[in-house]
């Protein structure tokens, strides 16, 4: 996890290179064997309150977000990376109150 302070004074939380095995792909063999996907998440968070109070309850629980994404991806079975990405974004927004997210999903073995 990294936090970057932007010019507009909004912080950004990064969760990078989550490597997760899942069923993904359109070919018959891809529906039978788990493949590794790599996921990067980037989302805004105002860290001022957490920094001022030094209290965990005022911070974003990025470990819970990472664990939630890992569990979801491991249990999923999509054909397209695009569908997986959309579903991850919805999960993070709905379950963790994140308003916007930048997301990268790649399948290293695909190329």
Summary of predicted features, one role per range:
Residues 2-111:
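N-terminal, polar/charged subdomain of small-to-medium soluble alpha/beta proteins
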């Amino acid at each position: 996890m990294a936090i970057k302070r932007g010019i507009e004074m909004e912080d950004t939380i990064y969760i990078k290179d989550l490597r997760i095995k899942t069923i993904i792909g359109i070919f018959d063999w891809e529906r039978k064997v788990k493949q590794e996907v790599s996921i990067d998440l980037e989302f805004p968070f105002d860290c001022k309150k957490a920094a001022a109070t030094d209290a965990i309850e005022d911070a974003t629980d990025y470990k819970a977000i990472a664990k939630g994404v890992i569990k979801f991806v491991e249990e999923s079975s999509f054909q397209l990376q695009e569908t997986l990405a959309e579903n991850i974004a919805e999960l993070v927004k709905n379950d963790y109150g994140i308003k916007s997210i930048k997301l990268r999903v790649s399948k290293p073995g695909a190329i």
